[in-house]
């Protein structure tokens, strides 16, 4: 029984390493946050992932609730570190907006996502 213990431990460790090697970038934090209701328009969109992303192959698009593109083809830049990317925003009026993003994680996989936030008139 004890002779198999080192083999089982080695197998477990190999499986654990293999699972981590195929992990993709996961969105951990966003500014504005998903489903946020804001009373002041944000100045930028910042997306923070659990691992570094390739800024040159990443894009962020801002759309309104009529699917009109508000911001597109703006150069994405690193914000806080290699895990965070963002774009500056023009002055936004009240309404519902959708952040659509595509990033290339360091493992070579594309990750896409979309979320909304709302700007309410503060009058």
Where are these regions (language model features)?
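A glycine-anchored, Pro-Gly-centered beta-turn/N-cap motif
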Residues: 93-102, 113
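Extended, polar beta-sheet/loop recognition surfaces of beta-rich domains
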Residues: 38-40, 44-51, 109-123
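Aromatic sugar-binding surface patches on proteins
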Residues: 80-86
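N-terminal edge beta-strand
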Residues: 22-41
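Bacterial N-terminal signal peptides that target proteins for export
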Residues: 1-9
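Cleavable N-terminal signal peptides
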Residues: 10-11, 21
